[in-house]
Each structure stands twice: as C-alpha cells, then as structure tokens.
C-alpha cells in the first residue's frame, strides 16, 4: 500500500513539475480576425520555429512576459497557407520576424510602437512599458 501511495505521489509531482505555463498563446487567423472584429486590445507576436532570430529572441521575450505577468498572442506565420498569409497582411504588414505588434481596440495605432527583430531585454521592457503593458 505504501508503494502505491509513493508511486501516485511521484506521478503527481512529475505531472505538476512538467506543466509549463506559457505567457504566449498561439492563435490562428480566424481567432486573430475575431479579436480585431471585437476591437480587443492585445499584443501579437509574429514568428515561427524555423526563424533563427525568433529562436534566439523567444527566451528573452518569455522571461520578460513571465517577470511582468503579461500574456500575449502569437501567429506562427509558417503555419499559414499562402492565401491566409496574404489575408493576414491586409491587417498587418510585416517585413520580417520576430515582430510584436500592439493592437489597441482592434487597430494598430502606429508601426513605430512595434518590436521588430531580435532586440534586447531592456528594449523589450521599454516597448511594453511605452504601450501600457508594464506600469
């Protein structure tokens, strides 16, 4: 009986320890369009797993999001079909990845607020502050 209790306890610890809360929620094009139509305010990360700059920047971004308890959304542009990508670009035109776009009430106020490319932790924090995500 004690072995069973120990085994179950170890399983619970293992499962709880492996659960990783992500502050980046991946959404698809339809979910993105719904957020825009609902005039939501959110930050959108555009990147993918095969982009070397995205791979390098993601740990920096995740640490900032965790430290400041911020949740953002992600569109993985490599998962979009050509048709979907062209439709996405009618909403947001990007020149490369990673890019973070700050949407206010369903619209991007200016492209100057974006985070473009692999930037430092300090620059990431400054942009999130200037867009009202960090007080």
Question: What does each of the following model-derived ranges do?
Answer:
Residues 49-52, 78-80, 107-108:
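Solvent-exposed loop/turn segments at secondary-structure junctions
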Residues 14-17:
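C-terminal motif of bacterial Sec signal peptides marking the signal peptidase cleavage site
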Residues 33-70:
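Local sequence-structure signature of Cys/Sec-based thiol-disulfide redox active-site neighborhoods
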Residues 101-135:
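Non-catalytic, surface beta->alpha helical segment in thiol-disulfide oxidoreductase systems
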Residues 89-103:
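Structural micro-motif
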Residues 69-85:
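Thiol-based oxidoreductase modules, predominantly thioredoxin-like and allied folds used
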Residues 19-32:
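Bacterial Sec signal peptide processing site at the extreme N-terminus
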Residues 1-4:
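Positively charged n-region of N-terminal signal peptides that target proteins for export
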